Amino acid sequence: MVQFYSPNRRTVNRHIITVTADNLDAQGQGVARHQGKTIFVAGLLPGEQAQVQLTEEKRQFAKAKLVKRLSDSPYRVNPRCPHFGVCGGCQQQHVAPDLQRESKASVLEHLIRRETGVTVSAKPVILGPEYGYRRRARLGLHYQIKQRQLVIGFRQNQSNELVAIKECPVLRPELEQLLQPLSQCLNSLKAVKRLGHVELVLADNGPLMILRHLDPLKREDKEKLGTFSVQHNVAVYLAADETSLESLNELPEPWYQVDGLKLVFSPRDFIQVNDQVNQQMVAQAIEWLDLQPNDNVLDLFCGMGNFTLPIGRIVQSVVGVEGVATLVANGQYNAKINNLDNISFCHENLEADIHHQPWAKLGFNKVLLDPARAGAVGVMSHIVELVPEKVVYVSCNPTTLARDSKILLEAGYQIISVRMLDMFPHTGHLESMALFSR
């Protein structure tokens, strides 16, 4: 038998070492140093000393698991959730909120400085409630044959297994209180073994639920779901596949308010998870853009108008460009019901060649963009060609924000302000926004 060897394979030295963390990374892992190498340790806070065991070793860094904590940081707090440490939803409930925000802001500042050479402050942080903030969640469903029970919950940390969730303090209370009765309802269905997942969403006009089912539901099951809907005042939608949606109720369309405007959305549409931070984020963008009645504004990756509509109330015209057709349709509808006839929405793929797209032939003096995690490298050169006075970049990935910032800086723009958005407390997610000006 031929055997193959990898000469570059690094053997992990699994003996126990003692380290002291001096920092946190964005994921909430303790950052320590040992013999010149950076060691990342989940569960360790700055100032804490611990015995750890290496689990992965690279040339420049290593990962380790906590064996025994030898001291406690004053920033260590008791997690509110009984599932913390097993559930993969939150990683930082053991960390005082002030330290969470400080660490994320420092990571953002470091990434921008490393990529652009510019020193910025990402504070003051835009923040909201530490718990009870999440107005949208997707829960997995798995039928356990031996236990004859459907598990409803989130994925375990670093695993595909589900944690049965009975409570979740980061959810809005209106959604958290649905968890146990929803579990009872779904376990009573004939189709209990053929359910995929469930999404809970809190609109301003009430909660809604989307149930993904793998086989057509019997009338008896629909009646049980209808009873659940009435008893708990929740709109129920059934999804037989990834595109179809059947409403069990004759209830009004879901909507939320931003900047005093009503935005109607489809149950599956993307909306910002944290309402309070979203309100502040929109207000900050409007302030930074210094909007005037004669402005012509471009809103890229605009969704259904979360920024577009509030901007449209102030300026001469605004064009929103979005790649998802349903979001564009909802944006157009929202502009109509809010009597904003100076807003245009374009359905275009911003990851394709944009130069032949109709909006690209127009002139704008101010630009806002809110791309997905991949960033906006495909449109940055065109933004530079527009020569706008101000650019506001909203980001869910600090790495791509830092990368794309470089293009604006090389074109003569300056970073005027940066803010870290604490959109997802107790998690490693880092949202931010930046203002650029010529």
Swiss-Prot record:
Origin superkingdom: Bacteria
Q: Entry's InterPro entries?
A: 23S_rRNA_MeTrfase_RlmD, MeTrfase_TrmA_AS, MeTrfase_TrmA_CS, NA-bd_OB-fold, SAM-dependent_MTases_sf, TRAM_dom, U5_MeTrfase_fam
* Keyword Hydrolase annotated: no
Reaction equation(s) it catalyzes: uridine(1939) in 23S rRNA + S-adenosyl-L-methionine = 5-methyluridine(1939) in 23S rRNA + S-adenosyl-L-homocysteine + H(+)
List the active site: C396 (nucleophile)
Q: Which GO terms describe its biological process?
A: rRNA base methylation
UniProt EC number: 2.1.1.190
Binding positions ([4Fe-4S] cluster): C81, C87, C90, C168
* PROSITE patterns hit by this protein: SAM_MT_RNA_M5U, TRAM, TRMA_1, TRMA_2
Q: Where does S-adenosyl-L-methionine bind?
A: Q272, F301, N306, E322, N349, D370
Report domain TRAM positions.
9-68
Q: Name one GO molecular function term.
A: 4 iron, 4 sulfur cluster binding
Protein's UniProt keywords contain Iron: yes
Protein keywords = 4Fe-4S, Iron, Iron-sulfur, Metal-binding, Methyltransferase, rRNA processing, S-adenosyl-L-methionine, Transferase
Which family is this protein grouped under? Answer: Belongs to the class I-like SAM-binding methyltransferase superfamily. RNA M5U methyltransferase family. RlmD subfamily.
Q: What does this protein do?
A: Catalyzes the formation of 5-methyl-uridine at position 1939 (m5U1939) in 23S rRNA.
Q: What is this protein called?
A: 23S rRNA (uracil(1939)-C(5))-methyltransferase RlmD
Q: Gene encoding this chain?
A: rlmD
